[in-house]
Amino acid sequence: MKSTRRSLNSKTTLNKEPKLSRTHAPADLSPVEWQRGLRRQFGREQAFGLENLTSEPFFSEFRVSNPASQSSYRVAIRGRGPGGNFCSCPDYATSELGTCKHIEFTLARLEKKRGAKAAFARGYRPAFSELYLRNDGRRRIHFRGGTDCPQGLRKAAAALFDLGHDGMLPDHRYDQLESFITMASKSGHEFRAYDDALDFIAGMRDAERRASKLAELFPRGAADPGLRALLKVPLYPYQAEGALFAVRAGRALVGDDMGLGKTVQAIAAMEILARHFGVTRVLVICPTSLKYQWQSEILRFSGKQSENAARVINGGRAQRQNDYRLDDFCKITNYEKLRPDLDLIAAWAPDLVIVDEAQRVKNWNTIAARALKRIDSSYAIVLTGAPLENKLEELISIVQFVDQHRLGPTWKLLHEHQVKDEGGRVTGYTGLAKIGQTLAPIMIRRRRSEVLKQLPDRLDQNLLVPMTEMQMFYHQENADVVAKIVQRWRKTRFLSDTDQRRLTCALQNMRMSCDSTYLLDQETDHGVKADELVALFDDLFAEPNAKAVVFSQWTRTHDIIIRRLEARGLGYVSFHGGVPSDKRPAL
């Protein structure tokens, strides 16, 4: 017997699947087989918890729990192969593999049970019928008739679904699905329509209704007079087009060149959604330095002046909790506060999320980026002025927030578009035009040259930036001097030459402190204005042959800007009154 046991163990070892590398695909496996194999391998190594939610021993619904992350997912087992099973985890929803580590873990546990081989050989044959969503290459609705399915329902299903392809619903028959669901629900037969399938159907219906409603509201499209009167300032034609595009898409990426007015397009879309599509809560997420800029422009463009029209979220946790409890139309927060405030945001439940300066989140695997993807909303508008076509990893992550299914699974996209050397190092990208076509339904991007004829000769834009605590100290110190001199002047009706000089100097110092403390002490550099300026350069210089001219009254302002340009490796020339006349022609 001992010899027999050793022989069985030896045979088991020989038949064990080889360990797969997570970074290099085996030559004898396709990318799909490799990715499925990785999930099978990883799932069977886990120590998850498993709970059967029904009395069925194999073809049942289970709860798979991960004690490490304290997360749990619903798993439905319908067979051994990919496609028919289901898991509520994000990987299953987006990988297009028809499996995940939770499904593979569950299968591994079930296969060890007595009767598993016979049960899986017989296959899944439930008494009830079900409508479900499959995502093994493309998301599609499927129908599976139960053993007790009435003949009338079977006949209706045969006319609607392609029973030769696992009950798949053809694209041209989605408009007939609602009546079928109604019929099945009233048949007296147990009919299950799962949430993910119903959500998918609802999303398609909502898109159709939005398009129909927009055509009714603005029959002339971007040229419709109703759009020109939408805000307190008239929209340029391309801005009206962008606003309509964002509303029609529901979740959209606006990637126009810097300076073309992405903010006003987002506010216009926000107004359309609020007036005609039931949006009552809007969350704006932007860099800290732009929060008050957003508040100012929402009030200016929309004409709303009440306190709850646009509230900036500031302060400690207690203050932010109080702010999120208030019944505001719009709340404005910054990236750094997303993770600690996720529970507050979820409780407030925004209908629309606007994400500004998305390109500033350089690493979309950061805490803030992961937190952003956990915010749930019916509508979303992402604004970025930087071209992302050649930054594939950043583009993937941004698009995942807008529409996690649009680009397909990351593993597949990188396999199709990354160019690697023999060592597996990424050396470039290929086929990027195909990505642009895939993104067309959710992404709009106009270059300045394309809309130049619609623009005035000059566009003025004032950007508000906050002052640091040290800047405020210098500013207030000089403001106190000004107040004392003015008070004495009003009292005596006389201003001495000394006081005139002190007054002028203090006012000048107040202005200089708004740039940076460096202008006053030549030692410290407290201030965000120069950093914001160079951040704008990052966007501007992403375009070839772009140039910028910066004017300042003070050469010390030039000095702090130059330091930042040199740190980024950006070329520049500096022209001021101290440049000798013989060197000026070269500049």
Give names to the regions the model predicted:
Residues 2-5, 28-30, 54, 117-252, ...:
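Charged, low-complexity
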Residues 227, 265-281, 453-480, 490-587:
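Conserved Helicase C-terminal RecA-like lobe
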Residues 89, 254, 550:
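Hydrophobic anchor at the beta1->P-loop junction of P-loop NTPases
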Residues 311-320, 335-340, 360-366, 554-556, ...:
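Conserved helicase motor
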Residues 69-122:
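Short Cys/His-based metal-binding microdomains
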Residues 275, 279-281, 296, 300, ...:
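Conserved P-loop NTPase motor "coupling/switch" region that bridges the ATPase
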